[in-house]
């Protein structure tokens, strides 16, 4: 069955977005389609139906394709836990930590896993849409490449090259990328897509004509810059603020070096009654109604950084004045008395003092907990759904059950004064009733209902509309083998 790959001239060129759009576009035409990313490097991950983890972008693409996320959609996931190393996840399961040089030698094994997953998807679906990583023209990464042209050559698939015109230099990006590829790789590029264009397309046409003449390859279309568009970012935290009313609930998130699953905060950013502020290194925590300690890939190191910034003192002051504090996953572990890492899973083996705001201790264990869960929040008995991705096992009387899970377990805890709440569950704010209950707990009255999952579905539909309106659908159908 056909495979079509999308590669980008740079990171954040629009690869994830275009694959998401094409998945829904193909599904509209009655095609059984699956997303695929050979290798992903990201700290945002999702739990799959088969009990593993993949990049969140592939989970969103699965939604666009009408599928449950599966580990075959992202067979190699790298989760950085230091400047030189990462946790390596193969077929949804962590196999250990590797330094960059060690992983380079491991790539043939990783490539075998990639090809196994791709073969299974090809057997099950009529079309596989593949997302590359970064740029295919990184000279230092070409040897042993499994994420871009190395994969395309191995499975003999055509490639669409996408570039972001909003950043400037789009023609240099496209032509320069093409020039740095080998002749066989150049032949795989079947066309270009220009992303995030604003203005009069007539003014761009001379450049498009030149590009086609210079390269001998067609421009498949120009996608517009979309406003009010909110699919999750794959990597960097989006710290842009949106102006809200003076009565908005003030929510502050300290940005720690190894913050993970920052997509947890996207629903807060979109809520019209919430002013979300990310605080970075060297910045003071401003007055707030709610402070949220996020997930972390290196909890002890991030907790040390939190203290270096003086944010622990700011949190204590915030609580003295009646503010609320929420810890999610690694943030929950920080709320306890001790964090023990006897196996050195996140750095040097040892223990660290927690913030001591809830009475429990955490031990980091090699076996990671991966679950999609449902249950009831202790606040208003609101229905909640989410997912667990953590290596820690937490025990102690302070874990009195912030969430009662449908599988019979309890999760997290709430302090006796009701000011501090901790949970292992990511995705807390995606369920409307739990979202509203948490906002009321934090001090917001007359809460407007926001259904983040419905907003995501709306934006996926909008993306598919853009493909139908602005790309050469006949050429796309030919590349996808759709008759």
UniProtKB/Swiss-Prot annotation:
The gene is cobQ. It holds the Pfam family GATase_3. CDD domains: CobQ_N (cd05389), GATase1_CobQ (cd01750). The keyword Signal does not apply. One of its GO terms (molecular function) is catalytic activity. Belongs to the CobB/CobQ family. CobQ subfamily. Catalyzes amidations at positions B, D, E, and G on adenosylcobyrinic A,C-diamide. NH(2) groups are provided by glutamine, and one molecule of ATP is hydrogenolyzed for each amidation. It comes from Ectopseudomonas mendocina (strain ymp). InterPro entries: Class_I_gatase-like, CobQ/CobB/MinD/ParA_Nub-bd_dom, CobQ_GATase1, CobQ_N, CobQ_synth, GATase_3, P-loop_NTPase. Keywords: Cobalamin biosynthesis, Glutamine amidotransferase. Residues 248-434 form the GATase cobBQ-type domain. Signal peptide: none annotated. Pathway: Cofactor biosynthesis; adenosylcobalamin biosynthesis. GO terms for biological process: cobalamin biosynthetic process. The active site is at 329 (nucleophile), 426. The keyword Transmembrane does not apply. This is Cobyric acid synthase.
């Amino acid at each position: 069955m056909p495979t079509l790959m999308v590669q980008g001239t740079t990171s954040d060129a629009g690869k994830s977005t275009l694959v998401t759009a094409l998945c829904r576009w193909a599904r509209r035409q009655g095609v059984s389609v699956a997303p695929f990313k050979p290798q992903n490097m990201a700290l945002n991950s999702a739990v799959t139906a088969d009990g593993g983890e993949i990049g969140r972008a592939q989970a969103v693409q699965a939604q666009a394709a009408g599928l449950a996320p599966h580990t075959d959609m992202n067979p190699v996931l790298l989760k950085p836990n230091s400047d030189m190393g990462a946790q390596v996840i193969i077929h949804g399961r962590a196999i250990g930590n590797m330094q960059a040089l060690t992983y380079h030698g491991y790539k043939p094994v990783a490539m075998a896993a990639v090809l196994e997953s791709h073969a299974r998807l090809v057997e099950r679906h009529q079309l596989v849409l593949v997302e590359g990583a970064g740029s295919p023209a990184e000279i230092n990464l070409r040897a042993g490449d499994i994420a871009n042209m190395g994969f395309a050559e191995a499975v003999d698939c055509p490639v669409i090259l996408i570039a972001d015109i909003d950043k400037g230099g789009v023609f240099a990006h496209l032509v320069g990328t093409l020039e740095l590829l080998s002749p066989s790789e150049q032949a795989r590029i079947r066309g270009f897509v220009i992303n995030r264009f604003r203005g009069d397309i007539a003014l761009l046409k001379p450049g498009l004509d030149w590009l086609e003449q210079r390269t001998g390859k067609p421009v498949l279309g120009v996608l517009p810059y979309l406003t009010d568009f909110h699919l999750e970012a794959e990597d960097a935290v989006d710290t842009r603020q949106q102006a809200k009313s003076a009565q908005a609930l003030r929510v502050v998130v300290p940005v720690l070096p190894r913050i993970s699953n920052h997509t947890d905060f996207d629903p807060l950013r979109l809520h019209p009654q919430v002013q979300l502020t990310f605080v970075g290194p060297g910045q003071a925590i401003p007055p707030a109604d709610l402070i949220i300690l996020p997930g972390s890939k290196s909890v002890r190191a991030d907790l040390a950084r939190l203290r270096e910034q003086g944010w622990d003192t700011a949190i204590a002051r915030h609580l003295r004045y009646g503010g609320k504090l929420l810890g999610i996953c690694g943030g929950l572990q920080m709320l306890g008395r001790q964090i023990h890492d006897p196996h050195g899973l996140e750095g040097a083996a040892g223990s660290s003092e927690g913030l001591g705001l809830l009475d429990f201790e955490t031990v980091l264990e090699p076996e990671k907990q991966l679950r999609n869960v449902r249950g009831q929040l202790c606040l208003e008995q609101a229905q909640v759904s989410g997912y667990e991705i953590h290596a820690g096992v937490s025990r102690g009387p302070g874990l009195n059950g912030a969430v009662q899970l449908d599988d019979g377990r309890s999760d997290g805890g709430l302090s006796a004064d009701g000011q501090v709440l901790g949970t292992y569950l990511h995705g807390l704010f995606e369920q409307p009733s739990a979202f509203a209950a948490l906002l009321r707990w934090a001090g917001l009255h007359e809460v407007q209902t926001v259904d983040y999952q419905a907003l995501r579905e709306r934006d996926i539909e909008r993306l598919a509309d853009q493909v139908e309106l602005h790309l050469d659908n006949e050429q796309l159908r030919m590349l996808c083998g759709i008759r």
